[in-house]
């Protein structure tokens, strides 16, 4: 693997949109993403396997979190300055890309922001981020608000949890194969269903709490995978889950993906945004 002289250092080109011409900004985004794809830098512990290419901009709340050249995690836009992602994705700062579809091309819909403020759940075990998955939820506050367009829109939160059997959708730029890494250029989607909590507990004995939920289409082996962490599980038009963890290799029969159950954190999310 070719090694860069150093991680991609964001210089004056990383100022907020408007500080540079649109063309220069677009080139910067392309360079950032291209470096990540070429070097294979994909972050996040979790596991879209056997999905399909999303219709362009059909998931306008989808966010890509980068750290320098590294595709760190997915995230979900929930307010003009706020993202929701997994706590195990936490870093000191992020480059945030919104309005993306094909990471090798620009279509004028892209927006970029920076963020240095993260608010992981206070009960998340940061000393064991890849082993203890309880309370794997975090808010990220961007340095400036985004502009809502057809390609950039927030996703609704709901205090009501969904029932087993509900059809949902997951999305991300994570690897499309496992255990080998194969990174897609375009955003991938997969249709999954919520699984009974007892079945989830049987799949991962002793590791499932009431703030987690499982989803998959086990007959077809669909699942989220590396690089998808922090991304959305969308059910009935609302954010019901955050991609958190699962079996490695991904999409193994009888081993569903595990998600943070967002409805259980509805009050906490709004409290953090209100106080910050």
From Swiss-Prot:
InterPro entries on file: Peptidase_S1_PA, Peptidase_S1_PA_chymotrypsin, Peptidase_S1A, Trypsin_dom, TRYPSIN_HIS, TRYPSIN_SER
Record's keyword terms, sorted: Disulfide bond, Glycoprotein, Hydrolase, Protease, Secreted, Serine protease, Signal, Zymogen
Domain Peptidase S1 positions: 48-274
Impact after mutating residue 44 to E: Knockin homozygous mice exhibit hyperkeratosis and scaling. Heterozygous mice exhibit mild hyperkeratosis
Localization per Swiss-Prot or TrEMBL: Secreted
Annotated propeptide span(s): 45-47
GO cellular component: extracellular region
Enzyme class, UniProt record, top EC level: hydrolase
Organism: Mus musculus
Lineage: Eukaryota, Metazoa, Chordata, Craniata, Vertebrata
Signal peptide: 1-44
Expression tissues: Expressed in brain and prostate (isoform 1) and prostate (isoform 2).
Protein name (record): Kallikrein-11
Xref: SUPFAM superfamilies: Trypsin-like serine proteases (SSF50494)
Disulfide bridge positions per record: 54-189, 73-89, 168-235, 200-214, 225-250
Residues with glycosylation annotation: 125, 191, 207, 236
Biological function: Possible multifunctional protease. Efficiently cleaves 'bz-Phe-Arg-4-methylcoumaryl-7-amide', a kallikrein substrate, and weakly cleaves other substrates for kallikrein and trypsin.
Recorded GO MF terms: serine-type endopeptidase activity
Residues of the active site: 88 (charge relay system), 136 (charge relay system), 229 (charge relay system)
Principal localisation: secreted
Family under the similarity heading: Belongs to the peptidase S1 family. Kallikrein subfamily.
Alphabetical GO biological process terms: proteolysis
């Amino acid at each position: 693997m070719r090694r860069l002289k150093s991680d991609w250092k964001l210089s004056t080109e990383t100022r907020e949109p408007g500080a540079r011409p649109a063309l220069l900004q677009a080139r910067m985004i392309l360079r950032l993403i291209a470096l990540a794809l070429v070097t294979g830098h994909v972050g996040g512990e979790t596991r879209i396997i056997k999905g399909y290419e999303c219709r362009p901009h059909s998931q306008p709340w989808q966010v890509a979190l980068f750290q320098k050249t590294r595709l760190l995690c997915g995230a979900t836009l929930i307010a003009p300055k706020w993202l929701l992602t997994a706590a195990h994705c936490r870093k000191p700062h992020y480059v945030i890309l919104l309005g993306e579809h094909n990471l090798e091309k620009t279509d004028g819909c892209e927006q970029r922001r920076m963020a240095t403020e993260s608010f992981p759940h206070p009960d998340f075990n940061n000393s064991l981020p890849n082993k203890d998955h309880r309370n794997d939820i975090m808010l990220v506050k961007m340095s400036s608000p985004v502009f809502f367009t057809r390609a950039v829109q927030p996703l609704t939160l709901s205090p009501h949890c969904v029932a087993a059997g509900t059809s949902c959708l997951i999305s991300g730029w994570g690897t499309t194969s496992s255990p080998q890494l194969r990174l897609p250029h375009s955003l991938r989607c997969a249709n999954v269903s919520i699984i009974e909590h007892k079945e989830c507990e049987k799949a991962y004995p002793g590791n499932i709490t009431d703030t987690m939920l499982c989803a998959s289409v086990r007959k077809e082996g669909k699942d989220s995978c590396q690089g998808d962490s922090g991304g959305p599980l969308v059910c009935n038009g609302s954010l019901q889950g955050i991609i958190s963890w699962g079996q490695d290799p991904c999409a193994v029969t009888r081993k569903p993906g595990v998600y943070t159950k967002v409805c259980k954190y509805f009050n906490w999310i709004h409290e953090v945004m209100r106080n910050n």
